[in-house]
From Swiss-Prot:
The active site is at S9 (o-(5'-phospho-dna)-serine intermediate). This is Putative transposon Tn552 DNA-invertase bin3. SUPFAM superfamilies: Resolvase-like (SSF53041). GO terms for biological process: DNA integration; transposition. Residues 1-143 form the Resolvase/invertase-type recombinase catalytic domain. Potential DNA invertase.
Amino acid sequence: MIIGYARVSSLDQNLERQLENLKTFGAEKIFTEKQSGKSIENRPILQKALNFVRMGDRFIVESIDRLGRNYNEVIHTVNYLKDKEVQLMITSLPMMNEVIGNPLLDKFMKDLIIQILAMVSEQERNESKRRQAQGIQVAKEKGVYKGRPLLYSPNAKDPQKRVIYHRVVEMLEEGQAISKIAKEVNITRQTVYRIKHDNGLS
């Protein structure tokens, strides 16, 4: 059986392209993950897919970084599939799916390619994080870094959350207890404390 696995790192990303790609390569069953886990253990759908595959199956992913967040995780997943005698197919790397000729050389080359790709993938991820941190630092120095938009604020996208924000400010100004406010408007005490701090309310 041909099993596909697709993952996007956030709910905002489009999953359709990956799904179409996997179907093009004959995936009969596709597992999809719409969350970003910091480790394989935090990717329940990947775990489910790996548990599902059986000896003789083919496991398809679009790129090697779908198999793990770093070099060790990728190699661990690859070895897990090997132990189960499941063929791994990476659609973005056609040569991985071609037989070189000599079985021993074939195995050696593919193992080597996977190790190199896993290492490069981890380096690219680290470099991306470094550039992001550098960009944030520059933005902070220029006074233009805004950070993530606040869920409850006077400028919140959701009008209902703007109403809640103003209600919290009103209750704080009335001197009501943090726990009472949090319970009444159904938000966390940490959020109430943050709104209190942002408004300079003692």
